[in-house]
């Protein structure tokens, strides 16, 4: 283990970093440091940490950091980031057994190579499988709920459990994963099909995303959930928020449900902009938008509660 001897859990083999910068890891490129950043070597290393950590230590799991605003004051306790030891992808029959750190697009490509259809939608979702399972990520007419078979998790106490589809209780952008648990791997089901046809559909999804979303900007994916019977982007546009800017935080002119960091935005700028959009949409349409992007961590000193 690399890191400080002050850390309360001994015997870890992974990388442990005190006061670790998180902003450079986030798609928005904003956010304060983690008190501790732990990158476990493997499942056993992570289980040891979860078993032995003090009960009072806050723990936050971060994946690809594509759907999160890390606040400017950083994150208390320990941030867990799963890396290469959790990114394996194997094909078993018509299923893919996927490590939680595997990127969604990589899973889609592996499924295509195996001639398994139904996972193409993952090519349109920035992030990793652990986060996709946790929030029932979806795009282009499908979601994790439609292809999920089971997930192996480590509980907050470090116990390995396998959860079935029914136990996850999927709903729109939601699952019933136990509090404090960490997804280790998941089994996703495909349907046999022609590999070239699958690759063609993936290419279409990637082209559509490139054309309609600010994929090359500092952004975090869809900001708000789609309310029942509405499209969030349309409500935002009708409220006059396209291009709205606070500091270097801007509502994308290309797709209104994306926030952008134009260069020097803070997390506070992004969060304040999002709340301003919510207020304007509520005043215009009476619809209360709910955040899809997770906002985590401490606000900076003196920052007002949003």
Curated annotation (Swiss-Prot):
Pfam families: FAD_binding_4, MurB_C. Its EC number is 1.3.1.98. The active site is at residues 173, 222, 292. GO terms for biological process: cell division; cell wall organization; peptidoglycan biosynthetic process; regulation of cell shape. Keywords: Cell cycle, Cell division, Cell shape, Cell wall biogenesis/degradation, Cytoplasm, FAD, Flavoprotein, NADP, Oxidoreductase, Peptidoglycan synthesis. Its cofactor is FAD. Pathway: Cell wall biogenesis; peptidoglycan biosynthesis. One of its GO terms (molecular function) is UDP-N-acetylmuramate dehydrogenase activity. Residues 29-193 form the FAD-binding PCMH-type domain. It is found in: Cytoplasm. The keyword Cell cycle applies. The keyword Metal-binding does not apply. Cell wall formation. NCBIfam families: murB, PRK13905.1. Belongs to the MurB family. This is UDP-N-acetylenolpyruvoylglucosamine reductase. It comes from Gluconobacter oxydans (strain 621H).
């Amino acid at each position: 283990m690399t890191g400080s001897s002050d850390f309360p859990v001994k015997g870890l083999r992974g990388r442990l970093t005190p006061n670790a910068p998180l902003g450079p890891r986030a798609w928005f490129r904003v956010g304060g440091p983690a008190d501790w950043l732990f990158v476990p070597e493997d499942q056993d290393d992570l289980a040891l940490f979860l078993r032995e950590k003090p009960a009072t230590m806050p723990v936050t799991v971060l994946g690809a950091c594509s759907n999160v605003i890390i606040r400017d004051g950083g994150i208390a306790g320990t941030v867990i980031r799963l890396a290469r030891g959790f990114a394996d992808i194997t094909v078993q029959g018509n299923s893919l057994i996927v490590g939680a750190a595997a990127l969604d697009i990589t899973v889609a490509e592996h499924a295509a190579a195996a001639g398994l259809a139904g996972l193409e939608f993952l090519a349109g979702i920035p992030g990793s499988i652990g986060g996709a399972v946790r929030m029932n990520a979806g795009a282009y007419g499908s979601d994790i709920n439609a292809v999920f078979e089971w997930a192996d998790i480590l509980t907050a106490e470090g116990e390995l459990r396998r959860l079935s589809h029914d136990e996850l209780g999927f709903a729109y952008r939601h699952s019933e994963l136990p509090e404090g648990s960490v997804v280790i791997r998941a089994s996703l089901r495909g349907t046999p099909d022609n590999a070239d046809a699958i690759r063609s559909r993936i290419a279409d999804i990637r082209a559509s995303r490139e054309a309609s979303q600010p994929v090359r900007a500092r952004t975090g994916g869809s900001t708000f959930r789609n309310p029942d019977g509405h499209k969030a982007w349309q409500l935002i546009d009708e409220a006059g928020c396209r291009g709205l800017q606070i500091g270097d935080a801007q509502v994308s002119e290309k797709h209104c449900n994306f926030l952008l960091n134009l260069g020097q935005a803070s997390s506070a700028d992004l969060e304040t902009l999002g709340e301003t959009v919510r207020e304007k949409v509520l005043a215009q349409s009476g619809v209360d938008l709910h955040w899809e992007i997770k906002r985590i961590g401490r606000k900076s000193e003196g920052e007002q509660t949003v």
